[in-house]
Amino acid sequence: MNHPAELALHKHMDDAANDKSTKSQETIKQIGLDVMGALARQFGGADKRDFRLRMSNIGRPTCQLWFDKNKPETALPRPTTFVMNMMLGDIVEAVFKGLLKEAGVEYGDSESVSLDVGEHTINGTYDLTIDGAVDDVKSASDWSYRNKFASFETLHSGEAFGYVGQLVGYATA
């Protein structure tokens, strides 16, 4: 832990744990609006299985993308917990941004980007930027943070979700 943003966030959280901090009404309202937007996206009725290349899937194995596009009927049904997991991630992102703001950490908010690759355009929306670098908010266990997300090398060596490709796509766009 040595990045100034991380230090500021930990200080803010320490203050909160010791009843020494408050949240502005503006920040609380923004967190609520962000969660409302996430609910609208998750329960908006759009078919999330329609295939298209997007930043969130470009790092996945090519064979998985091929099957997603050409044989979607062979996919296993999504578990009933899928939408809840997506919602928890959206809530974590909304609260995290509120914490950053209250800790005095400057960050760039979500932005939609497009990357032209050959004849295709890949679209996506990244979570935030800190110090001009694209970053992605993840909800994960303490074990995951210590063992999976500890460094770029650790993440790249054992990740099956395409996080590295996703971040490279956002940063390149």
Descriptions of predicted regions:
Residues 1-134, 141-157, 161:
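Metal-dependent nuclease catalytic cores that hydrolyze phosphodiester bonds in DNA/RNA
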Residues 163-173:
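An active-site-proximal "capping" alpha-helix that borders the catalytic cofactor pocket
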